[in-house]
UniProtKB/Swiss-Prot annotation:
The CW-TYPE zinc finger mediates its binding to trimethylated histone H3K4me3. InterPro entries: PWWP_dom, ZCWPW1/ZCWPW2, Znf_CW. Pfam families: PWWP, zf-CW. The keyword DNA repair does not apply. Residues 276-293 have a biased composition (Polar residues). The gene is Zcwpw2. Zn(2+) binds at residues 18, 23, 45, 56. This is Zinc finger CW-type PWWP domain protein 2 homolog. PANTHER family: ZINC FINGER CW-TYPE PWWP DOMAIN PROTEIN 1, ZINC FINGER CW-TYPE PWWP DOMAIN PROTEIN 2. Residues 264-295 are annotated as: Disordered. Histone methylation reader which binds to non-methylated (H3K4me0), monomethylated (H3K4me1), dimethylated (H3K4me2) and trimethylated (H3K4me3) 'Lys-4' on histone H3. The order of binding preference is H3K4me3 > H3K4me2 > H3K4me1 > H3K4me0.
């Protein structure tokens, strides 16, 4: 604990940070020394007019707590940190946690002020996997330093490590680049969250807004067209194969009928010297609308040297015609 604040030692004095990446300590300057600092140029510890704190190897000087200033009638006023600043937030029962100052998606601002117009709270998106957000008192929010040593974290160690690693990566980024990382603070996310679901009194979810982008239907159409084409080709091939089989069977039956007709049309009356009998000749003529005319059951013909009744030939021909009709009816 440093000297008592009532000594006016800290009144009107200015804190300046050393820009040496291996130091980044804050030094307390007198009004005269602070007036000599050029804001557009980097400042280092060796430029400090106070020899006690003019080296990067010297620790930061102690500074009284805010409560001590309040007890002695002083008001602690915090300078406003810019939007997108990488900060370190003091938490209760947790180690100091890195975060980014970003706008509240509902209020649209990242800082609030008290009645006197001084900074009161900041909206912080805490880093790590996963991110989280909260409004924090300005008294607990300060600049993040690369010299920060990882504190002992008794719970959620992996979460804490991921937060520090992300902070180190974002340290050299611009404020705009850091704000791009703040996924929980996007204005459109607030609208999405408020319309995410409509729930009935019984707690049954009746509708949801699908925030995912719809997949293009072009590929589906192409896939359906290709599938339809392949099915049509398969069906046409199958039908063609079946048609060829039917045609082949029909041709076989027609050849058989043609052979039988040729045998019927040949003159069957032959001279039988031993018996003197003459067989009657069948001469089929095809009337309109019927492939064959009627035959007498008692007539005889001689195909291939065997004697058969004409009625049996008619029955064979009729059966073959029925088979042809059955094959044709399939189409």
């Amino acid at each position: 604990m440093g000297p008592a604040p009532e000594s006016s030692e800290f009144v009107h004095r200015t804190w300046v940070q050393c820009e040496n990446e291996s130091c980044l300590k804050w030094r307390l300057l007198s009004p005269a020394a602070a007036a000599a600092v050029n804001p557009s140029e980097p400042w280092y510890c060796f430029m400090n007019t106070d020899p006690s704190y003019s080296s990067c190897s010297v620790s930061e000087e102690d500074f009284p707590e805010e409560s001590q200033f309040l007890e002695n009638g002083y008001k602690f006023v915090y300078s406003q940190l810019p939007l997108g600043s990488l900060v370190l937030v003091k938490l209760r029962n947790w180690p100091s946690w890195p975060g980014i100052l970003c706008p509240d998606p509902f209020k649209g601002k990242y800082v609030t002020y008290d009645q006197d117009g001084n900074v009161e709270k900041y909206y912080v998106e805490f880093l790590g996997d996963p991110h989280s957000t909260a409004w924090m008192s300005a008294a607990f929010v300060g600049h993040f330093s690369l010299t920060l040593e990882a504190a002992d974290c008794t719970k959620k160690k992996r979460w804490y490590r991921s937060a520090l690693e992300e902070a180190y990566q974002l340290y050299r980024c611009s404020a705009e680049q850091r704000l791009e990382v703040c996924c929980l603070s996007k204005p459109n996310r607030a609208k999405t969250d408020t319309k995410a679901a409509v729930v009935t009194k019984k707690g049954m979810q009746v509708s949801k807004i699908n925030t995912e982008k719809k997949r293009p239907r072009v590929r589906k159409r192409k896939r359906d067209a290709a599938l339809k084409c392949s099915v049509e080709i398969f069906c046409s091939d199958e039908a063609l194969s079946k048609e060829n089989m039917v045609v082949s069977e029909t041709e076989g039956l027609l050849k058989e009928l043609e052979k039988m007709l040729q045998q019927i049309q040949e003159p069957t009356a032959r001279e039988d010297e031993s018996q003197g009998e003459q067989l009657s000749q069948c001469s089929p003529e095809s009337p309109t609308g019927s492939p064959f005319q009627s035959y007498h059951e008692e007539d005889y013909i001689v195909p291939d040297g065997a004697g058969l009744k004409a009625g049996e030939y008619i029955e064979i021909i009729t059966n073959n015609l029925k088979k042809i009709d059955a094959l044709i009816s399939e189409f």
